[in-house]
Design a protein with these regions (language model features):
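Gly/Thr-rich phosphate-binding beta-strand-loop-beta motif of the actin/hexokinase/Hsp70
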Residues: 1-12, 28, 115
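ATP-binding/phosphotransfer module of carbohydrate and carboxylate kinases, centering on a glycine-rich
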Residues: 24-122
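A mobile, often basic/glycine-rich helix-loop segment
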Residues: 14-18
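Short, catalytically relevant binding-site loops at active-site mouths
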Residues: 1-2, 20-23, 94
Length: 122
């Protein structure tokens, strides 16, 4: 997952790179003897009643925690008293960001649409 930070003047400030949600769950599957490959979906509760439920809980709730912490630090360091628009994009944007306060827009295909627009300019 990447976090790209853009100023109010539309200037790229920098970014953050962290492991993606699928990379996290694939790592568990590939590096442990008995944990299954996950189908990612919203957990019903934090404490799972099965291995799959426990893994889904750890993946989704843990990932939201990672995102919240990084966003909080970006806001504190770069935009201490300014309003910030957070846009979630990518394949798991809806699953992860739909239950996160502070996310202004969820647009899973924004990058592809941007590439289409740039392609049409040429």
């Amino acid at each position: 997952v990447t976090f790209d930070v853009v100023s109010g003047e539309r200037r790229y400030i920098g970014g953050v790179i962290a492991p993606g949600l699928e990379a996290m769950t694939d790592f568990l599957y590939q590096r442990t003897a008995l944990l299954p490959r996950l189908s990612l979906k919203e957990p019903h509760r934090a404490v799972g009643k099965s291995t799959v439920e426990a893994m889904q809980s750890g993946a989704i709730f843990g990932y939201r925690g990672l995102i919240r912490e990084i966003l909080a630090r970006i806001k504190a360091e770069q935009f201490s008293r300014k309003k910030v628009a957070v846009v979630a994009t990518g394949g798991y944007a809806r699953l992860v960001a739909s239950r996160m306060p502070g996310v202004a827009v969820i647009h899973p295909h924004l990058t592809l649409e941007g590439l289409r627009i740039v392609g049409n300019l040429n």
